[in-house]
Design a protein with these regions (language model features):
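Small/polar-rich, solvent-exposed N-terminal microdomains that initiate assembly or binding
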Residues: 1-46, 77, 97-99
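Oligomerization/assembly interface segments of phage tail-like spikes and tubes
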Residues: 52-66, 103-113
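Acidic-leaning, charged glycine-interspersed low-complexity segments
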Residues: 73-116
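Short, surface-exposed linear patches
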Residues: 43-45, 56-59, 81-85, 110
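Short, conserved charged micro-motifs
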Residues: 67-73
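Generic structural motif
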Residues: 26, 39-41, 65-67, 112-116
Length: 116
């Protein structure tokens, strides 16, 4: 799934500004960036004692020193266009981290997967 997410977010831009998207941790210099991680696999579909499919959940953490609302909208849009469904009940409220000075928002998405 990570390769799909990396492909989806290759050259991700909001207002003509590149927004880096990294797995788990961002090590660059940009002050606006997104990290993502798998948080759960559940909701399995079983038949004849075999798993046929499941639901995979991913968190996307948006970090910014300024207004991030357009980024939130664009992430939701690109994820929906690629078959992911936003999970509002598993996403965070708006946060501000006093120790870093970053605004922070977590968006959770799910995608159904079928075993091959």
């Amino acid at each position: 799934m990570n390769s799909l997410i990396e492909k989806i977010f290759a050259d991700f831009k909001v207002d003509n500004k590149n927004i880096p998207v990294s797995f788990l941790k961002y090590n660059g210099q940009e002050t606006t960036y997104i990290t993502y991680q798998s948080i759960d696999n559940s909701g399995t579909l079983n038949a004849d004692d075999e798993i046929l499919g499941y639901i995979e959940y991913y968190d996307f953490d948006i970090f910014s020193k300024g207004n991030y609302l357009k980024i939130v909208r664009e992430v939701k849009k690109i994820m929906k266009a690629n078959g992911f469904m936003w999970q509002p009940s598993m996403s965070s409220g708006d946060m501000f981290e006093d120790d870093t000075g970053y605004y922070h928002k977590t968006l959770c998405f799910k995608k159904e997967r079928m075993e091959e």
